[in-house]
Amino acid sequence: MKILILSCNTGEGHNSCAKALKIAMERRDITCDIQDTLALVSDELSRRVANAYVSSTQGSLFETVYKIGGFVSDKIDFHQSIIYGVNRLYANTLYEYIRDNAYDAVVCVHLFPAEAMTALRRNEMLRIPTYFVMTDYTCIPFLPETDLDYYIIPHEHLIEEFVEKGVPREKIVPIGIPVDEQKFTTRVPKSQARQQLTES
């Protein structure tokens, strides 16, 4: 089996989740690759989006944009958002990458590749299993307009929120956010931990 994990460089949480998934799969002898989705289009695009994201998280701008996204997502007819439209533009490039590398399944840890994968599924270009792993503790704006096989969410207490937003209940799997267990099982003396935290 060969799995593709699609991420984006918009905050390290998505990439950390992707790395944890890769480690877990490789321990089970599953071949797994991580790909920055936007870098398939161009490294420059990936850098620009990453820089725009980092800039948007300064001050209250991110919160404002997030709230606007939530409002718009709740009001639009699904599959008509500009987010879906933009990510649909590189769907063919993504399809060729998946086909050429013979992946058996795709896991998305970011909304952008989930939107592109949705476009591929709607056009019946892709018939392999697709998964979304939520890295936030809420249903993010525009997620309900995606159409993947399963949505892995952080906790069962969030099921109703995702259902109310439009994610089909039968597709929700509440098993948590993947983390690298080695980082949380290695004991570090308190003095060393304090020193590491103050150096950050």
Where are these regions (language model features)?
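Extreme N-terminal starter segment of soluble prokaryotic enzymes
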Residues: 1-4
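A short, glycine/small-residue-rich beta-strand->loop->alpha-helix junction that serves as a flexible
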Residues: 8-19
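Glycine-rich phosphate-binding loop signature in dinucleotide/nucleotide-binding domains
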Residues: 97-103, 199
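A nucleotide-sugar donor-handling region in carbohydrate enzymes
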Residues: 149-200
